[in-house]
Curated annotation (Swiss-Prot):
Effect of residue 63 to K/N: No impact on proteolysis
Keywords for this protein: Developmental protein, Differentiation, Glycoprotein, Hydroxylation, Secreted, Signal
Taxonomic source organism: Arabidopsis thaliana
Protein name as it appears in the record: CLAVATA3/ESR (CLE)-related protein 1
Encoding gene per record: CLE1
Secretion signal, residue range per the UniProt entry: 1-22
GO cellular component: apoplast
GO molecular function: receptor serine/threonine kinase binding
Residues the record lists as Hydroxyproline modifications: 66, 69
One GO biological process term: cell-cell signaling involved in cell fate commitment
InterPro entries listed in its UniProt record: CLE1-4
Family assignment from sequence similarity: Belongs to the CLV3/ESR signal peptide family.
């Protein structure tokens, strides 16, 4: 009986492995031909963000000054 269970288990594993190799590819749009609308919009947002960053520069601080000394500092 144990031998039969082992053979059945081995058979099911072999069948599942053979079916997974014949399935469709995991990333059908990997070649870049068809892209989704969300992906295109994300690329546009990223491009606009990079352009804004390049205009402003990398070394400029985005912090705002509080307008005076902080009395609670030190």
């Amino acid at each position: 009986m144990a031998n039969l269970k082992f053979l059945l288990c081995l058979f099911l594993i072999c069948v599942s492995l053979s079916r997974s190799s014949a399935s469709r590819p995991m990333f059908p749009n990997a070649d870049g031909i068809k892209r989704g609308r969300m992906m295109i919009e994300a690329e546009e947002v990223l491009k606009a963000s990079m352009e804004k960053l390049m205009e402003r520069g990398f070394n400029e601080s985005m912090r705002l000054s509080p307008g005076g000394p902080d009395p609670r500092h030190h």
